[in-house]
Amino acid sequence: MTISKRSYARVNGLNMYYEIHGEGQPLVLLHGALSAIGTSFGKLLPDLAKERQVIAVEMQGHGHTADIDRPLRYENLAADITALLTQIGIDQADLFGWSLGAGVALQTAIRHPEYVRKLVLASVTYNSGGLYPELLAGIAHATPEDMAGTPSMRNI
């Protein structure tokens, strides 16, 4: 599989990294938290791109996309996705989100339904109320040093 395009788009004050693979009906891949394109979808990409135009993004503070000074919220990330789709000329797409990406896909469908044809959601929460308090506490105190050496960081 070859990458058709590897680029950055300026959306909502963010310099968002994305890749486009293949041709056909657009499919947007939205990765999980503390992950990126390769760690969430690397093994799936070649098969998905055989019959689809796969648009894989790296959201705020993940992979090649730097963090900016704004809350990391589903609503903000959903607005980034629709801004990217507009910028690259995609009117409507199927969204496949995993974990954090599933929440972003869900918010995209709720807030910007005109962009969404179909949703595939894996391991999704609607909001943080569905998460264990211990998990939220761990996330709140996590640092880059805590993640050093983990598979998520080695593969970025």
Language-model-detected regions and their locations in the chain:
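The conserved SAM/SAH-binding core of class I Rossmann-like methyltransferase domains
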Residues: 55-57, 98, 122
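Helix-loop "lid/cap" segments that line or gate small-molecule binding pockets
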Residues: 151-156
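Flexible "cap/lid" loop of the alpha/beta hydrolase fold
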Residues: 103-106, 110-111, 116-149
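Conserved HGGG/HGGXW glycine-rich cap/lid loop of the alpha/beta-hydrolase fold
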Residues: 9-67
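Conserved alpha/beta-hydrolase "nucleophile elbow" surrounding the catalytic nucleophile
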Residues: 93, 97-99
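Residue in the alpha/beta-hydrolase core beta-strand immediately N-terminal to the catalytic nucleophile
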Residues: 58, 94, 117-120
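Conserved acidic catalytic loop of the alpha/beta-hydrolase fold
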Residues: 75-93
